[in-house]
Design a protein with these regions (language model features):
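Beta-loop-alpha module in the N-terminal Rossmann-like domain of NAD(P)-dependent dehydrogenases
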Residues: 48-105
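N-terminal Rossmann-like dinucleotide-binding module
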Residues: 1-46
C-alpha cells in the first residue's frame, strides 16, 4: 500500500485526501496546512494526524506527497520533496511560469 501525505487541505486538498483515504491501494498517513481551521476540519473528516511540512519530509514512511497548496508554493515544495526522495503529485498548474518549470525539471 502506497503511503501518502497531503499538503494543503483546503477545498481541493480535502477532496484529494478523501480520495486517497478511500482507495484500497493507498493509505493517507498525514495532512498539513498552515490554516488551523482547515486542519481541524480535515482531521474531523479524515481522522488522520497533522504533521508539519518538515516532519513529512523527514518521515521515511511517507512515499508520496500530494501538493494542494496555492500555486506560488508549488516550485519550492516540489523541489524540497524531491530532495527528500519523495514522489510528488502536484495539483495544476505545476508552477507559475516557464522558469519555475525549468528549475523543477533541472532538479528532477
Amino acid at each position: 500500500m502506497i503511503k501518502f501525505a497531503v499538503i494543503g487541505v483546503g477545498t481541493f486538498g480535502i477532496k484529494r485526501a478523501t480520495a486517497i483515504k478511500n482507495s484500497n491501494k493507498a493509505k493517507l498517513v498525514a495532512i498539513c496546512d498552515l490554516n488551523k481551521d482547515n486542519v481541524l476540519k480535515a482531521q474531523k473528516i479524515l481522522k488522520v494526524p497533522f504533521k508539519s511540512f518538515d516532519e513529512i519530509l523527514k518521515d521515511n514512511e511517507i512515499e508520496v506527497v500530494c501538493i494542494c497548496t496555492p500555486n506560488k508554493f508549488h516550485k519550492t515544495m516540489i523541489i524540497d520533496c524531491l530532495k527528500s526522495n519523495k514522489n510528488v503529485f502536484c495539483e495544476k498548474p505545476l508552477c507559475r511560469n516557464l522558469d519555475e518549470a525549468k528549475k523543477i525539471y533541472e532538479f528532477s
